Design a protein with these regions (language model features):
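Sec-dependent signal peptide recognition
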Residues: 2-8
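Catalytic centers of hydrolytic enzymes
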Residues: 21-29, 33, 38-48, 52-64, ...
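Hydrophobic h-region of N-terminal signal peptides that target proteins for export
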Residues: 10-19
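Acidic, metal/ion-coordinating pockets
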Residues: 19-308, 347-359, 369, 529
């Protein structure tokens, strides 16, 4: 994808206040990357892994551009999300916290001119991004985020822009993170910070920088999705910037992992893909006469990066780091004592769900855990677990959220959950189904097949209490909570701390709304703790306990008990499950 712009006449007016250049032609190239998410190494870090896009492959591409254009004529920028989201950054973020962080060293090796802090970089937490920013500063690379403001003084927590000289040309690079960061992550990750909308802030900053620094070229790098350009989404302000900015040559965006390039009037915008698979290139030609820029040409394109063509010198330079990361990723972190079968959750309390509840209850002293299955019909085999297996054991990027719920609200929550799960049946009869299933066309086979009527991602059960679910009763009267797991009284008007996932906390499944929390403000007002990703909790659980043992995670005085009644119900639901998945 390639776009070319030629701007003349008014260009002289736009840059008349810039610092003087000698008459002649100046040719620069802006190479832009983003959303690498820690895919730094060309070789796979997992046992049995396959080669894929990498920072080292991007480095080879950048080397080629520099060889063609001249190193002093190439500007290298990144739109963020570089040190969070995969195994390699996890190692340097949370395991080896005493060595110098790898990302600043990699960025220095590639000679980045400026890097933006993406939303995932903030998600790593203060200890990580503060450390990375400090080390990048030592390497001479600014970590930019001009709209991340300190609550203490209202000023940018990270620099808003950087001035660089390339080929005699003065270039201003302004950098911004996602304006919706506060709603995209746990509040503790960004404590003491607030995030401003990019509109009108970026234009205001551009005007100030042009007045103060008098650059010849202005680049805005923002970790924001392209969006629709309608000004309605804080998380997606890329096209808003593209349509409204004046005095800017190049806008680089990220966050949505898209691969796009567009142009209009005197500006181009590029969205740089993900995980080392793409790079943007904008060739800029300035023509100077009488000390003024009288025309400029912008030629923007997106390039696919070949994973097999990587920087072998860079690979050799960081071989020791690769070895440390691979050793950690492929190393044993714990053991699962007995295989866990997820499909059992449909019709009874099971080891698999006890394990999920135990994870939440191990991370914070909650009264009750509320959770749905992660595997619709799967198995977690017994045996050793390597770090690279943690994503298989816990396949989603959920985080722990703890909030206050009354006993009455918990009861309503569970009633709504089981209503999505089961039909009312007073007695068993032929061709009846307790589990809510239906027949519909399977488009992979063209045949009719049994499917769940509702998503099992919203089939929450509870731990920490003892209760029954009566399938003969209608919605609103099925769940009977007898007492707490430890035998103490369960009270409808008492407040309890309950563990849920971030998926549930944003309203997914409608269970909190059914409990009486009508909107996000109602939920936010009840939150008492925001925890880490459950994968991190699982890793810590293994490090502390060594294993997942059903005999330990299923202790009745901790997780409590629940069951379907009357006696025919579990067998009837099991038969329905076998219609779905076979015996």
């Amino acid at each position: 994808m390639k776009i070319k712009l030629i701007i003349a006449a008014m260009a002289a007016l736009a840059v008349s206040a810039c610092s003087t250049l000698k008459d002649g032609e100046y040719n620069l190239s802006v190479v832009s990357t983003g959303d690498g998410h820690g895919y730094w190494f060309a070789k796979p870090i997992e046992a049995g892994g396959k080669a894929r896009g990498s920072l080292m492959a991007q480095s080879a591409f950048v080397n080629g551009v520099r060889a063609e254009k001249g190193a002093d004529n190439v500007i290298l920028v990144d739109a963020g999300d570089n040190f969070f989201g995969s195994g390699a950054p996890f190692y340097y973020n949370y395991v080896d916290t005493t060595s110098s962080h790898l990302y600043p060293r990699l960025a220095s090796y590639m000679k980045y001119d400026a890097v933006v802090a993406g939303h995932s970089d903030f998600e790593s937490g203060h200890r990580v991004y503060d450390r990375v920013a400090k080390e990048m500063k030592k390497e001479g690379i600014p970590l930019l985020a001009g709209n991340a403001l300190s609550d203490r003084n209202g000023k940018p927590y990270f620099p808003a822009y950087s001035i660089i000289k390339k080929g005699g040309v003065k270039v201003a690079v302004l950098g911004y993170t996602n304006a919706a960061n506060a709603s995209l992550m746990d509040g503790s990750c960004v404590s003491g910070l607030r995030f401003e909308s990019l509109l009108p802030l970026v234009q205001e900053d551009v005007d100030k920088v042009r007045s103060k620094e008098k650059p010849h070229i202005v680049i805005v790098v923002a970790h924001t999705a392209m969006g629709k350009g309608d000004g309605l989404k804080l998380e997606k302000q890329g096209l808003d910037l593209f349509k409204s900015l004046r005095g800017v040559d190049v806008v680089v965006t990220g966050h949505d992992h898209a691969n796009k390039v567009m142009s209009a009037d005197s500006i181009v915008v590029l969205d740089c893909g993900r995980t080392g698979q793409n790079a943007g290139v904008t060739d800029i030609k300035l023509v100077v006469k009488g000390g003024k820029v009288v025309s400029r040409t912008l030629d923007a394109r997106m390039t696919s990066i070949k994973s097999e063509e990587y920087d072998t010198a860079m690979e050799e330079a960081f071989e020791a780091d690769y070895d440390k990361v691979r050793s950690f990723i492929t190393g044993t972190v714990g053991e699962i004592k007995k295989g866990l079968v997820s499909r059992e959750f449909y019709y009874k309390q099971c080891d698999y769900m006890n394990f999920l509840h135990a994870l939440a209850m191990s991370a914070y002293p909650v009264d009750i855990s509320l959770s749905a299955t992660l595997l619709i019909d799967g198995k977690v085999p017994a045996g050793e677990v390597r770090y690279q297996d943690i994503r298989k054991v816990y396949p989603y990027e959920n985080k722990l959220v703890v909030l206050r719920l009354t006993g009455a609200e918990i009861l309503k929550y569970l009633e709504a959950s089981y209503d999505a799960w089961i039909n009312t049946m007073t007695e068993p009869y032929e061709n009846a189904h307790v589990l809510k299933i239906k027949q519909s066309k399977d488009y992979s086979t063209g045949k009719m097949a049994w499917k769940l009527a509702k998503s099992p991602a919203n089939f929450d059960s509870a731990a920490g209490i003892n209760y029954t679910v009566d399938v003969t009763k209608p919605y609103g009267s099925r769940v009977v909570i007898t007492d707490m797991a430890d035998g103490s009284k369960f009270e409808l008007d008492k407040e309890y701390t309950a563990a849920i996932t971030t998926y549930r906390s944003v309203g997914s499944g409608g269970l909190l709304k059914a409990a009486g929390l009508e909107d996000m403000k109602s939920v936010e007002d009840r939150i008492v703790y925001r925890g880490p990703e459950f994968r991190t909790i699982l890793y810590r659980y293994f490090k502390k306990n060594g294993s997942i043992d059903p005999a330990v995670v299923g202790v009745p005085k901790v997780v409590g008990s629940w069951k379907f009644v009357p006696e025919f119900a579990p067998a009837a639901i099991k038969a329905d499950v076998e219609l779905l998945y076979g015996k």
